[in-house]
Swiss-Prot record:
It comes from Mus musculus (Mouse). Residues 648-657 have a biased composition (Pro residues). Residues 319-402, 1093-1197 form a coiled coil. This is Genetic suppressor element 1. Residues 1095-1112 have a biased composition (Acidic residues). The modification Phosphothreonine is found at T433, T905.
Length: 1213
């Protein structure tokens, strides 16, 4: 134990090295408790050397033995109790008893030899040889544990060969042994390496196992509490604990926590141990019963009958008392047989292990050579890549610098790690015992990149597993006994030395290959930064963390190692990483081993504890190697101590971090330019390894750990954002982009730019323009002829689509419903007649922005350009004012002229006959356009008529100006019902003028002759019609009068009206000139007209002309365009307002209701309070009255009382 690093005396259950050596140094889980417990357990504790001296050591030793046994066993009988006595807990336990063969366990245990052991640190190194496993059962184990130091000595002496054999196998610390699977792995989960005796976790040493650590294995191995019959030998043999063993395991004091009161557990029944369950039972409180190996226990269990060899006479007596001699003998015989079998098995296993180790070593060397060749090739590739990358990097260096601080730290750490791993890796391999190390290396070789990885990982494991490593390294843990420890140590060290030599050689090669590999990987990673594999690798890595994670190669060989007991020993920390349970995918590891490894290193640095999934990969890599390195741990540890110290202030990283955590601490120093490290790495082996490691880490971290998936990802991880990965070459984080991402981005760009994007690679830029041009062409073409075929409509109906016409009808229906609901006056049918022809939107157009606000909006110019698409123009403030003035004039005129307008219009108008419906629409002409039109029409109309009319109008110049235009406009509108509707909306806008306009159109008689009846009918009809039609729109229009939107709408309307007028005006013979009206400068015509009109209208005309010109420039009619949009919008707004009103009224009603209800509630609560207070008053009053009553009663009752007394007194008299 001394040799082993006790540093972490904490039980390094997880620390068993996977090294072929089953030998593991284990610190007793609860050394002092063990000692105390053992001693308390009874003098036997002291008597059993191990118990006393190795109390901690013993439980620990027991655990170690167990582990060793298991490690050995795994091959033969991973956990089969029979195959390896160790494997069956009972057997293991009994092994101490049975071990007696080798040495009288009892006596030996009892002898103070055990005491000598105590001197050794609690940690016990158990070198499980195959025999050792047997020894567990066999004396070697027992002496180490149960037998006690003397037995241990004897065993050491007697079993030195065993010890040595075991030495080959990992010596398993008792605590490890105690935990069936120190890693908390279920026995099944741990695939035991045939090389290593499986740690027979099943047969965990109870003492070794913290009382609470009862694993399934224990339970499984231990029979449930059986009746004495059940517990009989039949079960015992599997249990592997004969009474003696049981006694060894369960000292009475051990049993004290829960003596086997249960009949099943009676020591009487050899099977009370029933797989010696109790030892594992948490029964012994950790303090009370330090887990002790049965051998360590060597306390007599009162209930257990020790085999004669094992037990003192007293023990024997105790046992015999409780156990039938028959069962004890049976147990003993079984144990003996088992032990014999175990010993043989262990020997075979040891031989196998040795053979395997040799094989592995050779394999590793071969692999390493292959790896080196591969690395050299990769190096060449990497050089090319690097040059390429450097160019890119130079470009991105600036960006990288920004990111560097974050990423580089981890990188530097990684470098540090790498350096360590380089130094230590060779040792780790050696430590690992060539077998394991070689295996690792072989695996590494198998996986080109992985080889280096193990090297990197090893250092980390060293840091992480210092104590374990020390224990491993010292496999000669004094725990077993000085001799055994020495033998084991010698064996281990010889193996280590060989392994080290081998490793040093390999490591040099590996370092070089790693440097090249690292470079290549950097390049690859750079190329594959987006590779999703990395995260997977990270996940896989965690599993491989134990051994495989070190490299892909490791990954390939790792699973076995992982399953082998030792890696799991270290694995417990890996358990930190969640992933360890998952099976890592060697394939993925191989591909992304570097990346993963990098990720792991990073993870380690960044988030040792968090590492978990990502760290699994990173840490495990390092960890695994380290674990393997544990055999050479001493050296590596020493070496590491320095490097670790350099890199990681806390050489013993928190267990959670394990190797990984080690790394983070280890490499606090800034990553430093990763590239620089890389360059240095070429120069220095350490440098090389470190860069590869750091790169691996950075890459891995970036690709793997950075990935969000990796829990390990630490904030520190370079890629806090999983989307970002560290680009080694660029030395900066760059966004991780997958092909899918690129595809999506391209598609989105194509969408935005309006070209078609196909995933087809044949698609190239040249096509883009064509496609765009085609799309533009399609978009700009006039719309196709309306196709209302039933097929198409049915198809569209599937999507809830229909034709505009049907939509209009539906909208009209809705409007009717709304009107009915709101009792609005029904608008004139023509409004709905043509699709959206009503220019109502014009009036409806409203906005909460003031024109000035809109004029000052940032994208004002863009908006103006947009309007030009629709032949609309922006109206400047002056124009708007003019228009507003015009509108006001029109309104005034309308009001003034309403009366005169009829006659004026009748007499002055020679307009084409207008159908009644047309007149209805005509009012719109009044719009500003009409004013323009008015001058034109006035000038055009025969001067006589005009003059007369003008004169009439002069008094009302405004009227007159407007009127002439209205007539023409009206006529035009009348002729064009649709146009009329549009104008109508305008008219509504200029509603004031509309009334007189209406009369005019109505009054127009055919050929300009006014038919007396027509004016009346037409006027009345039109008037009413317009009134109703315009009523709703008027309000909106008036609201919007000031708005530029309205003005623009007006303009467009004017244009429309002008166009409309053209026909009617042309129709009216008197107004031949009106055709000029065609939305062309009507104002000019107006100017020709009477000067008065001209003057009045000049300003109006100017503004109107401008707006008209702008509005009329394009054939607005073709696409209802903005007007239709405005109209739809208007409808939408109106509906919204309606809805809002309904809801508001509802809301108000509800509020009122709520208020009244709340008032009522308040009143009620008040009345309730009053009632309550009254009730209280009543109660108190009642109580008061009652009290008075009682008082009165008492007063009245006293005499009553006396009466009877007196009565009685007197009665006898």
């Amino acid at each position: 134990m001394k040799g082993m690093s006790h540093e972490p005396k904490s039980p390094s259950i997880g620390m068993l090295s996977t090294a072929t050596r089953t030998t593991a140094t284990v610190n007793p889980l609860t050394p002092s408790p063990l000692n105390g417990a053992l001693v308390p357990t009874g003098s036997p504790a002291t008597s059993s050397t191990l118990s006393a001296q190795a109390a901690p050591s013993s439980s620990f030793a027991a655990a170690l033995r167990k582990l060793a046994k298991q490690a050995e066993e795994p091959r033969g009988s991973s956990l089969s109790s029979e195959s390896s006595p160790v494997s069956s807990p009972a057997t293991n336990h009994s092994s101490p008893a049975s071990t007696p063969k080798r040495v009288p366990m009892g006596p030996i245990i009892v002898p103070p030899g055990g005491h000598s052991v105590p001197s050794t640190p609690p940690v016990v190194t158990i070198a499980p040889t195959k025999t050792v496993n047997g020894v567990w059962r066999s004396e070697s184990r027992q002496d180490s544990g149960s037998r006690g130091s003397s037995s241990g000595r004897e065993r050491l002496l007697v079993e030195p060969p065993l010890a040595q054999e075991k030495a080959a196998g990992p010596a398993i610390p008792s605590h490890l042994l105690s935990t069936p699977y120190p890693f908390g792995l279920s026995p099944g989960s741990v695939v035991q390496d045939s090389r290593f005796q499986p740690l027979n976790l099943q047969r965990p040493v109870h003492h070794v196992v913290p009382p609470s650590t009862v694993t399934e294995d224990y339970l499984r191995s231990f029979r449930p509490y059986h009746t004495a019959e059940d517990l009989r030998m039949s079960s015992l043999p599997p249990l592997g604990l004969d009474p003696a063993t049981a006694a060894a395991y369960y000292h009475p004091s051990y049993l004290a926590p829960h003596p086997f009161p249960h009949p099943a557990f009676r020591m009487d029944d050899s099977y009370c141990l029933s797989a010696l369950r109790s030892p594992f039972y948490p029964i012994p409180t950790p303090g009370s019963l330090p887990p002790l190996h049965p051998s360590a226990m060597h306390l007599h269990l009162s209930g257990v009958r020790y085999p004669p060899e094992l037990s003192h006479s007293s023990l024997a007596a105790l046992h015999s008392e409780r156990m039938s001699s028959l069962s004890a003998e049976r147990l003993q015989m079984d144990e003996e047989l088992r032990r014999e079998r175990e010993r043989e098995r262990e020997r075979e296993r040891e031989a196998d292990r040795e053979r395997e180790k040799e094989r592995e070593r050779e394999q590793r060397e071969k692999e390493r050579e292959k790896e080196l060749e591969r690395e050299r090739e990769k190096e060449r590739e990497r050089e090319l890549e690097r040059q390429r990358e450097q160019r890119a990097r130079e470009k991105e260096l600036l960006a990288a610098k920004a990111l560097e601080p974050t990423t580089f730290l981890p990188v530097a750490e990684l470098h540090g790690l790498r350096g360590h791993s380089t130094e230590e890796r060779p040792k780790p391999s050696e430590q690992l015992t060539p077998t394991r190390a070689e295996k690792l290396k072989d695996v590494g070789l198998q996986a080109p990149k992985p080889v280096q990885h193990p090297l990197h990982p090893v250092p980390a494991p060293h840091h992480t597993v210092p104590s374990l490593i020390s224990s491993h390294g010292i496999f000669s843990l004094p725990g077993s006994s000085a001799t055994t420890a020495l033998l084991i140590q010698r064996t281990n060290e010889e193996e280590k030395w060989l392994a080290r030599q081998r490793r040093l050689r390999q490591e040099k090669e590996d370092r070089q290959s790693q440097v090249s590999e690292f470079r290549q990987q950097v390049l690859e990673q750079h190329l594959d930064l987006g590779r999703p594999l990395v995260p997977t690798e990270a996940e896989h890595r965690p599993e491989s963390t134990r051994p495989g994670t070190n490299r892909h190669e490791q990954g390939s060989r790792e699973p076995p190692q992982h399953f082998g007991g030792p890696p799991p020993l270290i694995s417990p920390k890996p358990q930190q990483h969640t992933v360890p349970t998952a099976l890592w995918n060697p394939v993925s590891l191989m591909d992304n081993a570097l990346e993963t490894r990098r990720a792991e290193s990073h993870s380690l640095h960044s988030h040792p504890t968090a590492f978990e999934p990502s760290r699994q990969a990173a840490v495990p890599l390092v960890k695994v190697e380290r674990v393997y390195c544990s055999e050479k741990a001493e050296e590596p540890r020493k070496r590491e101590a320095t490097p670790l110290d350099k890199y990681q202030p806390p050489p013993p990283p928190p267990p959670p971090r394990e190797a990984g955590s080690l790394e983070p601490q280890t490499f606090p120093h800034g990553p430093g330019p990763f590239l620089t490290e890389l360059e240095k790495s070429t120069q220095t082996i350490l440098g090389q390894q470190r860069p590869s490691l750091s790169q691996a880490t950075s890459f891995g971290e970036l690709s793997g750990p950075l990935k969000p998936g990796s829990p390990y990802c630490h904030p520190t991880a370079r890629g806090p954002d999983p989307a970002y990965i560290y680009d080694e070459f660029l030395q900066q984080r760059r966004k991780l982009v997958s092909k899918l991402d690129l595809e999506e981005r391209r598609r989105r760009e194509a969408q935005e730019k309006g070209y078609y994007y196909d995933l087809d690679d044949s698609y190239d830029e040249s096509d883009e323009e064509e496609v765009r041009a085609h799309l533009r062409c399609v978009a700009e073409q006039p719309p196709l002829k309306l196709d209302t075929s039933s097929e198409k409509l049915e198809f569209l109906q599937l999507f809830g689509l229909t034709t505009q016409q049907q939509k209009e009808e539906l909208v009209a229906q809705k409007r009717r419903k709304r009107r009915r609901m709101l009792r609005e006056r029904s608008p004139s049918p023509p409004a709905v007649q043509c699709k959206r022809q009503t220019p109502s939107p014009r009036l409806a157009l409203s906005t909460r922005y003031s024109p000035d606000e809109m004029n000052n909006s940032p994208n004002f110019e863009e908006k103006r350009k947009f309007l030009t698409f629709f032949n609309l123009t922006h109206i400047s403030a002056e124009k708007r004012k003019d228009k507003e003035r015009l509108v006001e004039m029109l309104r005034a005129m309308k009001q003034r002229a309403l009366s005169a307008a009829d006659s004026v219009t009748n007499s002055s108008r020679d307009s084409p006959p207008v159908s009644l419906s047309e007149p209805a629409t005509q009012p719109a002409p009044l719009e500003t356009d009409q004013p323009v039109g008015v001058p034109a029409s006035l000038s055009d109309v025969p001067k006589t008529t005009e003059t007369g009319r003008l004169e009439q109008l002069r008094p009302q110049e405004l009227l007159r100006v407007q009127e002439p235009a209205p007539p023409s406009g009206e006529k035009a509108r009348l002729s064009e019902a649709p146009g009329g509707k549009k104008s109508l909306s305008m008219l509504h806008y200029l509603r004031g003028a509309a009334p007189k306009d209406i009369p005019v159109p109505l009054s127009h008689s055919i050929n300009g002759k006014s038919k007396p009846w027509e004016p009346f009918v037409a006027e009345e009809f039109a008037h009413q019609f317009h009134e109703s039609v315009l009523q709703s729109t008027q309000k909106a229009l008036q609201k919007h009068k000031g708005n530029s939107a309205l003005l623009s709408a007006e303009q467009s309307h004017k244009v429309d009206t002008a166009i409309h007028y053209n026909i009617p005006e042309l129709q009216s013979s008197s107004r031949v000139p009106l055709p000029q009206h065609n939305g062309q400068q009507e104002p000019p015509m107006g100017r020709k007209g009477p000067p008065m009109q001209e003057a009045d209208q000049d300003s109006e005309e100017d503004s109107e002309e401008d707006s008209e010109e702008e509005a009329e420039e394009a054939p607005r009619r073709q696409w209802q365009g903005i007007e239709a949009i405005f109209e739809a919008y208007q409808e939408h707004i109106e509906e919204q307002n309606l809805e809002r009103q309904v809801l508001q009224t509802q809301c108000r009603r509800l509020e009122a209701q709520n208020y009244s209800l709340s008032l009522t509630a308040e009143q009620l609560s008040h009345s309730m309070a009053e009632l309550r207070s009254q009730k209280q008053k009543m109660v108190s009053e009642r109580e008061r009255l009652q009290a008075e009553l009682d008082h009165l009663r008492k007063c009245l009752a006293l005499p009553t009382m006396h009466w009877p007394r007196g009565y009685f007194k007197g009665y006898p008299r």
